[in-house]
């Protein structure tokens, strides 16, 4: 049996009845650290060149990141050269810390400090794996030996930093595989490292807690972080950071809960690039805060540009459903969704609190157009069809006509099996409702009122058909035309639905009329636009009757 759950065991959970983090709220953004140029880079099939790293670094600076991990200079000549270029060409703003990673070896730590000579602000990040799997199966050391590795590395970092006093140094330590480590042992190692670095004496220290591999639900990780927060020495003098991965799909949630549990800093990558299933996505985490009215401190307003550069350099395409950044995340195909969105957008005024249905943020905030929101396919309904006509062409239809047109468009979508553009919806609207049948163009009308009755003289025709004069009487212009049509075609013409609208000033016509006409058991709808409401109403009735006549003639011809 190859698919056998019995080969696994559940992760151990912490007995922590005094947990406080579930009642906490995130009220400000954590300190963000972008690790795209190191952790993200090492996961690429084709790692970045120095030129690509420079472009990526510049984008991170422009977005507002203040701590940027730039490489692993002791392990890569490209990373070493990149560090030197950043420093020697003065590419690092004064308020930005560059961060580098090194293993806990004396020669590699010395090489790392060589790469940082002349830096204004730098973070040296050391790590060693502390979980039972690594202690017992990979390195064959006991707990004491594991702790000794971390302490020696901390001493080497302190010694090398003292040789370069002009740099403002930050020291960072990660008990790698923290999420799979006994939490009390992780605290023991952290305290031993802090005893060397003495953050209480002014040294800036970051204690980074990695979910190197995500092994539990986010609440378990939050318990672990809160336990560290509550029990490490020098807590008020150190920055607790977290570094989550997405092996179980909860990297962002784990980081958010960790902040609730006391973390001050979060590491991640743009769009979540990283080993295996990726690092925590800084875009999602930042925009989650933004959607709650919290300034993330990072400018994601040019989302398409961010996505384009990340895709170009990493050669990884962004999923169309990726939160906040994917092509389809602000698109609605479902009819009920479209109807709700349309109504909410119609009510929204600049300056209002955003509460639109199905849109957690205003798409315009990240550079997206409202034109992308409602899109039409076979799942769309009247709301979506009405929305694209109103949005793109300024045409506002009555509900009964929305339903009718939606059925027509849905048939087209089912036949094609794909998306229907707004231009195609408009063409369908024109051909089925707005275009005037041959010979049924309103040429002129004359209305005379006498004894509460209107006598109408209406001429119809076009360049291809001779002009026909219609005469009728009624309570108003429309009823007079209906009377005239009944006399001409010998049927019982009834207007069963009618709506009229004024059009914007930027159109040739000033009025639009929508009608549904019934003759016997048949109905036909039509729309007309004209310079005044009377002309629009008369033309709409003429078009509807004309279409019925065309249909009857076609049926007779085909029988």
Curated annotation (Swiss-Prot):
| CDD domains named in the record | DRE_TIM_LeuA (cd07942)
**Which compartment or compartments is the protein found in?**
Cytoplasm
E.C. number, please?
A: 2.3.3.13
Q: Which reaction does it catalyse?
A: 3-methyl-2-oxobutanoate + acetyl-CoA + H2O = (2S)-2-isopropylmalate + CoA + H(+)
Signal peptide position in this chain?
none
**Which SMART domains does the entry mention?**
LeuA_dimer
Q: Which Gene3D superfamilies match?
A: 3.30.160.270, Aldolase class I (3.20.20.70)
Question: What SUPFAM superfamilies is this protein classified in?
Answer: 2-isopropylmalate synthase LeuA, allosteric (dimerisation) domain, Aldolase, post-HMGL domain-like
Pfam families linked: HMGL-like, IPMS_D2, LeuA_dimer
Principal subcellular localisation of the protein: cytoplasm
Query: Could you describe the subunit structure of this protein?
Result: Homodimer.
Protein's name in the database: 2-isopropylmalate synthase
* Originating species: Alcanivorax borkumensis (strain ATCC 700651 / DSM 11573 / NCIMB 13689 / SK2)
């Amino acid at each position: 049996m190859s698919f056998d759950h019995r080969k696994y065991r559940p992760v151990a959970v912490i007995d922590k009845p005094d947990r406080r983090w579930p009642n906490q709220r995130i009220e400000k953004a954590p300190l963000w650290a972008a690790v795209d140029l190191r952790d993200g880079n090492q996961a690429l099939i084709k790692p970045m060149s120095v030129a690509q790293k420079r472009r990526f670094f510049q984008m991170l600076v422009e977005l507002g990141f203040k701590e940027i991990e730039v490489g692993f200079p002791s392990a890569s000549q490209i990373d070493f050269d990149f560090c030197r270029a950043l420093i020697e060409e003065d590419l690092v703003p004064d308020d930005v810390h560059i961060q580098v990673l090194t293993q806990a070896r004396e020669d590699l730590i010395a090489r790392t400090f060589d790469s940082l000579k002349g830096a204004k602000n730098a973070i040296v990040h050391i790590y060693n794996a502390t979980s039972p799997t690594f202690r017992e199966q990979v390195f064959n050391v006991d707990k004491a030996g594991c702790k000794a590795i971390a302490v020696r590395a901390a001493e080497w970092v302190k010694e090398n930093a003292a040789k370069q006093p002009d740099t403002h140094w930050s020291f960072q330590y990660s008990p790698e595989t923290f999420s799979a480590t006994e939490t009390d042992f992780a605290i023991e190692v952290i305290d031993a490292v802090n005893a060397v670095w003495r953050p209480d004496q002014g040294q800036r220290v970051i204690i980074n807690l990695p979910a190197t591999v995500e092994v539990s639900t986010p609440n378990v990780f939050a318990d672990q972080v809160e336990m560290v927060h509550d029990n490490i020495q020098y807590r008020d003098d150190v920055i607790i950071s977290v570094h989550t991965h997405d092996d179980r799909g909860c990297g962002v949630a784990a980081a958010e809960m960790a902040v609730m549990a006391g973390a001050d800093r979060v590491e991640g990558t743009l769009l979540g690039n990283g080993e295996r299933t990726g690092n925590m996505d800084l875009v999602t985490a930042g925009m989650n805060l933004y959607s709650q009215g919290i300034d993330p401190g990072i400018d994601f307003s040019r989302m398409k540009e961010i996505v384009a550069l990340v895709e170009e350099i990493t050669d990884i395409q962004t999923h169309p459903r990726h939160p906040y950044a994917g092509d389809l995340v602000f698109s609605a195909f479902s009819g009920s969704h479209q109807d709700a969105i349309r109504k909410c957008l119609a009510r929204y005024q600049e300056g209002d609190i955003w509460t639109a249905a199905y849109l957690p943020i205003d798409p315009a905030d990240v550079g997206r157009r409202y034109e992308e929101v409602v899109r039409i396919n076979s799942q769309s309904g009247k709301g979506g069809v009405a929305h694209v006509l109103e949005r793109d062409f300024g045409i506002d239809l009555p509900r009964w006509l929305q339903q009718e047109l939606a059925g027509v468009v849905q048939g087209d979508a089912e036949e094609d099996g794909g998306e229907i553009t707004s231009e195609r919806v408009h063409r369908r609207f024109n051909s089925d409702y707005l275009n005037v049948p041959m010979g049924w163009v309103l040429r002129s009308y004359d209305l005379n009122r006498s004894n509460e009755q209107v006598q109408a003289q209406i001429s119809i025709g076009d360049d291809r058909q001779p002009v026909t004069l219609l005469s009728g009487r009624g309570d108003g212009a429309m009823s007079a035309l209906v009377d005239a049509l009944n006399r001409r075609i010998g049927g019982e013409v009834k207007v069963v639905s009618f709506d009229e609208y004024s059009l914007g000033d930027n159109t040739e016509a000033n009025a639009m009329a929508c009608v549904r006409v019934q003759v016997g058991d048949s109905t036909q709808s039509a729309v007309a636009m004209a310079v005044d409401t009377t002309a629009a109403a008369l033309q709409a009735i003429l078009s509807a009757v004309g279409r019925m006549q065309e249909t009857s003639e076609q049926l007779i011809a085909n029988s």
